[in-house]
Amino acid sequence: MLIKVKVFPNSKREEVIKKSEDSFEVKVKEKPEKGKANREVLKVLSSYFKIPESKLRLVKGFKKRNKIFEIK
């Protein structure tokens, strides 16, 4: 299953907002440098979906706000 994620780094709090069945907004506190925000998004999404991080994979958008994740 693929999901679309719009990431908001440098946020005051971490949260996941569901926009549609396969579209989410994720706010994280980390800065978008050296993959820190991407790693934090993985943690937040795994907590939201209640699955291990190993079941999530960033497919597209490594250096962009709009990303596509695969849930295995």
Residues of each region from the PLM?
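A generic beta-sheet turn/junction motif
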Residues: 9-11, 62
